[in-house]
Amino acid sequence: MQLNSTEISELIKKRIAQFDVVSEARNTGTIVSVSDGIIRIHGLSDVMQGEMIALPGNRYAMALNLERDSVGAVVMGPYADLAEGMEVQCTGRILEVPVGRGLLGRVVNTLGQPIDGKGEIENDGFSPVEVIAPGVIDRRSVDQPVQTGYKAVDSMVPIGRGQRELIIGDRQTGKTALAIDAIINQRNSGIKCIYVAIGQKASTIANVVRKLEEHGALANTIVVAASASESAALQYLAPYAGCAMGEYFRDRGEDALIVYDDLSKQAVAYRQISLLLRRPPGREAYPGDVFYLHSRLLERASRVNEDYVEKFTKGEVKGKTGSLTALPIIETQAGDVSAFVPTNVISITDGQIFLESNLFNSGIRPAVNPGISVSRVGGSAQTKVIKKLAGGIRTALAQYRELAAFAQFASDLDDATRKQLSHGEKVTELLKQKQFAPLSVAEQAVVLFAVEFGYLDDVELSKIASFETALLDYSNRNHAEFMQELNKTGNYNDEIKDTLKGILDSFKANSAW
């Protein structure tokens, strides 16, 4: 069969008409330098601050410096094989991490990828790591407690749901132990927990995970790990990733607790990135926006009202408030709380628990310094019974510290001073507590009642610990119903006062400790 020229031209025209041309606009650039996890890229004219840049090998970098002729970006992950001349492209997306209940009980890295060898995670979607904190109208005042299980904390520096309470102290003063015990104490409270480990040894993180598992708290906890071997970029972003995972629960009318361990290392990682990006250094070589680094993170911890939750869930959840409580940890050098990062975080948070190495080394653990530890909003969230019974403890300790300093120089002391010193010593002894041994509200109430109403006056200092153990054992064994009811309500009235008095009277009359 022969085709003439007209048929051929018609056929070509038909094919051309059917040919579908899809033009795809891509914003690409070329790597011009790679050093210490920082890449400089030529091109990318439409890139945005914080945008993810796709690199070869299914990796990403985050654009942090937008300059006239180049873009400075930080690589998320290994960068040894990246070379000058490689092509990269914009994604039009910012960093997002998986969120949802499927993450509970798992250990993940900054990007939300599982690192515990337990298989894939079923998530409920993705959330951006950088989110604007809820506004003033969306918030509600803090009026519900978070029980840490520590007598010293719950009585003197109470923490409320939606509060930011800083744990600050030198290395090896029990900061992580306090935070981990607070997480363990939430295993039956319904509060979901997130533990963010920044710049720690992998062995230390593994030990924390093991302890949480041993005490039945891991099923209720998400562990976000950015160990010391991870890049500075992942250490810098880890707290924001953990916060996004916590906000998932807050925005759905639930309560969550997040521990950042610790923000000093995050600030150091951010300083490293900033200096490599040639940003101008300020005090202690930190960049000018290191305050904003922490303020935008900690402001996201809040208690949100019913309207916010209803609006966020599109009417699925009604009449519930949500909260995200933050326990940031800061490590000081030789007790210097006036350094740059500690003062920044103290000014952002709603109070601080100051742990002192002198107290820790002298056997007072938790080593809480009651003089400069404070909770600015927790008082209104404190359980009624604890609030009523703990009023005299801080005063007694403050007077004891003052008198103890004078007593070193005085040879003869009057009876009132001796009595006050003895009482202070006993209160200090009573506030000591072993790790992984949190007390319930009712147990704390019984102990504080004994302090408040003079039941310790005739107990020798060396027998305080055995007195407390025997008292709690007696209360739980013989008055289990009352203890359960007190744990449930947390109330304090004349009837409860009389019952507590009866417990203490019968215990002292019948028990040898």
Curated annotation (Swiss-Prot):
Pfam family, one: ATP-synt_ab_C
Keyword ATP-binding: yes
Record-marked site positions (Required for activity): 373
A GO molecular function held by the record: ATP binding
Protein's membrane topology: Peripheral membrane protein
Record field: catalytic activity: ATP + H2O + 4 H(+)(in) = ADP + phosphate + 5 H(+)(out)
Annotated Gene Ontology cellular component terms: plasma membrane; proton-transporting ATP synthase complex
Origin superkingdom: Bacteria
Keywords: ATP synthesis, ATP-binding, Cell inner membrane, Cell membrane, CF(1), Hydrogen ion transport, Ion transport, Membrane, Nucleotide-binding, Translocase, Transport
Annotated residues for binding of ATP: 169-176
InterPro entries linked: ATP_synth_asu-like_sf, ATP_synth_asu_C, ATP_synth_asu_C_sf, ATP_synth_F1_a_nt-bd_dom, ATP_synth_F1_asu, ATPase_a/bsu_AS, ATPase_F1/V1/A1_a/bsu_N, ATPase_F1/V1/A1_a/bsu_N_sf
EC number, UniProt record: 7.1.2.2
Subcellular location: Cell inner membrane
Assembly with partners or alone: F-type ATPases have 2 components, CF(1) - the catalytic core - and CF(0) - the membrane proton channel. CF(1) has five subunits: alpha(3), beta(3), gamma(1), delta(1), epsilon(1). CF(0) has three main subunits: a(1), b(2) and c(9-12). The alpha and beta chains form an alternating ring which encloses part of the gamma chain. CF(1) is attached to CF(0) by a central stalk formed by the gamma and epsilon chains, while a peripheral stalk is formed by the delta and b chains.
Similarity annotation: Belongs to the ATPase alpha/beta chains family.
Its job: Produces ATP from ADP in the presence of a proton gradient across the membrane. The alpha chain is a regulatory subunit.
Protein name according to UniProt: ATP synthase subunit alpha
Organism the protein comes from: Haemophilus influenzae (strain PittEE)
